[in-house]
């Protein structure tokens, strides 16, 4: 009777949720199964095998809520030297550790906030989206190229030495990158030994021998704009250039952006390897477009400002304090400020200023270049040790409606032409207070 009453009580307690069903089964003594406690001896000395963390990978046994998505839907992504690519989600409290992971995870239109100085050892390459990169609280911060920068591959070049950031397209109609309040420093570093363009297409060429093409590069085949906004600084390029744009890519330098050298005593070299032609310049165009707006600067540079192998160059900012490096640069010291060739077009707008250029010609408009124009208000001035032509033009069109003044062109001309070049000096054109061995215009 007591056992019957106990059974009734236990049934009632189970129904009311006062006891677990396992208690009911054990107490009744006639359950079809039993719950056994694992013996402690079975757990003694047992270890959990940890899998190593690989790039972009996860520990197989690491605790996690869900697998990390390949693209983060958040509009803000965060990166810090104290972050973690494998386990964090890119939030402010759980930042990524590398810019490469951040651009990979970021959705189209996202802003990436760099929260500390970083040393970068792999390319931040992204496809088919537009991103912004800026410094977070406490910035501006500096991202510096590592001496151990990793190679990467694509379908055109196989394995090669990449830029710090690459903006590419495969299917999107528009892509882009905007930098502001951040410093990217190549630190004069390079991987590879040959200063020349890597070879694309079907070839047995070993592209790993070529140095990196830029700090930032875009080979986009759809409209792409790389914008250096206020506070964006590119320093000490160690490869072919600071920024390279080809095909439909466009570079815009807004007011407050700077490309410069800051390393004491730094001079570029092209090495002695076969096939090495030397660095191109701070900006390297191959069919792309450059727009330097008023207030932007290319300054304190060894070698060259702009090298345009095709494309359009529009200068409204300042190019200053550039010393030619005849033994190192591609095309030697021809066009220290701007080198135009291969149907390229160059224009100095009304706010353009070129000054303090030394040891070579300032503007080179030859090699198949199309035209060079100085608009009213533009100036080329204060070049006390030029030792070259201000402008050299061949088989092209030159318009001077700005001012060329205070230039000491030892043993050379202010404007030297060849091969049927058409020259127009506009109503606002002024060539004054210069020293030229052969004359102002020949």
Question: Can you say where each PLM-predicted feature lies in the sequence?
Answer:
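Short glycine/acidic-rich loop motifs that flank beta-strands on beta-rich extracellular proteins
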Residues: 121-124, 145-150, 161, 183-194, ...
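Right-handed parallel beta-helix/beta-solenoid
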Residues: 26-101
């Amino acid at each position: 009777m007591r056992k019957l009453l106990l059974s009734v009580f236990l049934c009632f307690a189970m129904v009311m949720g006062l006891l677990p069903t396992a208690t009911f089964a054990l107490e009744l003594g006639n359950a079809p199964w039993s719950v056994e406690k694992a013996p402690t001896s079975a757990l003694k000395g047992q270890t959990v095998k940890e899998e190593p963390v690989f790039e972009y990978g996860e520990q197989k046994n690491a605790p996690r809520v869900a697998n990390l998505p390949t693209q983060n839907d958040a509009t803000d992504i965060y990166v810090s030297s104290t972050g973690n690519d494998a386990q964090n989600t890119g939030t402010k409290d759980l930042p990524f550790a590398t810019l490469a992971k951040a651009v990979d995870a970021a959705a189209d239109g996202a802003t990436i906030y760099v929260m500390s100085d970083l040393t970068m050892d792999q390319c931040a390459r992204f496809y088919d989206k537009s991103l912004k990169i800026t410094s977070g609280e406490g910035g501006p911060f500096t991202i510096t190229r590592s001496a151990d920068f990793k190679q990467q591959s694509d379908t055109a070049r196989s394995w090669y030495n990449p830029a710090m950031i690459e903006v590419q397209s495969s299917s999107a109609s528009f892509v882009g990158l905007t930098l502001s309040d951040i410093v990217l420093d190549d630190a004069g570093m390079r991987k590879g030994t040959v200063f020349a363009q890597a070879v694309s297409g079907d070839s047995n060429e070993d592209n790993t021998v070529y140095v990196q093409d830029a700090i930032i590069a875009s080979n986009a085949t759809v409209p792409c704009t790389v914008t250096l906004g206020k506070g964006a600084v590119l320093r000490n390029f160690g490869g072919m250039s600071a920024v390279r744009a080809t095909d439909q890519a466009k570079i815009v330098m807004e007011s407050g952006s700077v490309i410069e050298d800051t390393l004491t005593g730094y001079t570029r070299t092209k090495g002695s390897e076969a096939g090495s032609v030397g660095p191109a310049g701070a900006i390297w165009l191959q069919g792309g477009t450059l727009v330097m707006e008023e207030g932007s600067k290319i300054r304190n540079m060894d070698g060259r400002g702009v090298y345009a192998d095709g494309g359009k160059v529009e200068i409204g900012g300042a190019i200053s304090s550039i010393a030619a490096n005849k033994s190192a640069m591609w095309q030697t010291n021809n066009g220290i400020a701007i080198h135009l060739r291969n149907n390229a077009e160059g224009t100095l707008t009304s706010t353009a200023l070129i000054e303090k250029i030394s040891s070579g010609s300032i503007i080179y408009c030859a090699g198949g270049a199309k035209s060079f124009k100085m608009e009213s208000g533009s100036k080329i001035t204060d070049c006390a040790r030029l030792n070259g032509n201000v402008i050299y033009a061949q088989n092209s069109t030159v318009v001077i409606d700005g001012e060329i003044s205070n230039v000491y062109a030892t043993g050379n001309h202010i404007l030297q032409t060849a091969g049927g070049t058409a020259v127009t000096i506009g109503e606002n054109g002024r060539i004054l207070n210069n020293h030229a061995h052969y004359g102002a215009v020949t």
